Amino acid sequence: MCGIVGYVGHRPARDIVVDALRRMEYRGYDSAGIALIDGNGGLTVRRRAGRLANLEATLAETDSNDGDGLGGSTGLGHTRWATHGRPTDRNAHPHRDAAGKIAVVHNGIIENFAPLRAELEAAGVEFASDTDTEVAVHLVARQYTQGDTAGDFPASVLAVLQRLEGHFTLVFASADDPGTIVAARRSTPLVLGIGDGEMFVGSDVAAFIEHTRDAVELGQDQAVVLTADGYRITDFAGNDHLEAGRDFREFHIDWDLNAAEKGGYDYFMLKEIAEQPSAVADTLLGHFDKNRIVLDEQRLSDQELREIDKVFIVACGTAYHSGLLAKYAIEHWTRLPVEVELASEFRYRDPVLDRSTLVIAISQSGETADTLEAVRHAKTQKAKVLAICNTNGSQIPREADAVLYTRAGPEIGVAATKTFLAQIAANYLVGLALAQARGTKYPDEVAREYRELEAMPDLIKRVLAGMDSVAALAERFAPSSTVLFLGRHVGYPVALEGALKLKELAYMHAEGFAAGELKHGPIALIDENLPVIVVMPSPKNAAMLHAKLLSNIREIQARGAVTVVIAEEDDDTVRPYADHLIEIPSVSTLFQPLLSTIPLQVFAAGVARARGYDVDKPRNLAKSVTVE
């Protein structure tokens, strides 16, 4: 998500930090900032909302006025992707303590920031921003001046780290200790660059690849103290018994800058597919507490949720497919009727809306023109509108009554991947919140469903680890002119999404069908050697859909088609009928799409690459569709 850089050494930090921020612009951001510490104990912070050019203009203005404060050989930099607080100058990083002595930059979410902020405010601390980040710098300042580690900057940071909950990377610098940077990570990435008489720290190696190729990747719940002469890695308690190779990884970077931005992958899309475990985990983070779904930021009370008597979901493209999946979950958990509508069609058919209607508008960018117009139409009919969006401060959340942000981070590839899985997770959170408020699920039932959802990131990692065979299948079927996708129940929207991905990336004719419709026309398309990809329901499915889809597969094979079947790993009955079998872990029916989608993403990217197309920038498509 956010881009972080830190430098301590013998050269002027300003240009090094700004250049590093420029190299990390590919990550996406809505504001940028820099903190510089000079040898005289001065800390200067400059930050601006908008593009990096805005920050550079501010730095140039400082130069023209007096030029003071922008020297020094220790610096921090940050490009922000907003999660707490709107994208404004005051919410941009770095943040400082009240005395202006300590600066911090942060990526991730401090889950327990609300009670920590209340504690600090009760002690008289005044906050200058709406962010969770500012809590960390005030806690360190108090620990440094009043705590049992007073006067010891690194020890004060470690003491505070032990109080923080969530997923985060934090990097601190202090004017009282100008040659030192203290950094830490929990779940979000952090790498060090080892130079000659200088050290770097960053969200990824793009931050320092022009200066050094020797790097260290920190492990989970580890901190590092950096000086120009070297580094010391500890756990959050300060223990330094850690060993390279076992607890953290030392490596040499062989990539060029272009590859570094993509994390060593050939395309951003492949990198983003690999980031799906963290996209889902981050979207769920902080939304379950004391056996309850907690959606504080969405701004709809339990009473308002109880008054809902029908739900409409409006979206376009991949987001529409996530809405189709949400229908199954919300209806099952809440017993509310749910309609899913293409946003481009919604307002042209005079849908029946009123004050008891909840309209869920799903948009990755928050700027999708058709979805925005659907939101405006719903508002004129007095319906309540909940936006599910990946971009803080965008137009759709601003006009909606409530918002639930996915936390997938910037998605550079035009074809949606990690934002799709994050949308599914967010949709399911809404469904569980509705069930909880309406009493259609007991608290222990809500908790059980959430715990299975919470377990999905680890299962997604397992699926990703087995994708080599899918890449090989993509090579084999790249010359095909048509591919069909079949599914039942939640497998049907997955089939639609698989077909869309293949159209977008490989410019190939692809269609997704509900398998029960096969006899009603699509079976006429089946001929010799046609690839048909089948998303198999669980053999434990109570509706007997597994047996019905087995029958469909036999019909397809009888006509000479080649079957590629995505099935759960304990599904032995499907093996004789699959020409190619892709196995995924066994999960409850509603959660299977979070796993079965992944092979289809990898397949589409592989076919596109084999056909010589740009996976990240398919022709005629844009990431954000801002015209109707």
Curated annotation (Swiss-Prot):
Ranges for domain SIS: 301-440, 473-618
UniProt-listed InterPro entries: GATase_2_dom, GFAT, GFAT_N, GlmS/AgaS_SIS, GlmS/FrlB_SIS, Ntn_hydrolases_N, SIS_dom, SIS_dom_sf
Protein name from the UniProt record: Glutamine--fructose-6-phosphate aminotransferase [isomerizing]
Highest taxon of the lineage: Bacteria
Localization of this protein: Cytoplasm
Lineage of origin: Bacteria, Bacillati, Actinomycetota, Actinomycetes, Mycobacteriales
Gene name tied to this protein: glmS
Molecular function GO terms recorded: carbohydrate derivative binding; glutamine-fructose-6-phosphate transaminase (isomerizing) activity
Documented EC number(s): 2.6.1.16
GO biological process: carbohydrate metabolic process; fructose 6-phosphate metabolic process; protein N-linked glycosylation; UDP-N-acetylglucosamine metabolic process
Region Disordered: start-end pairs: 61-94
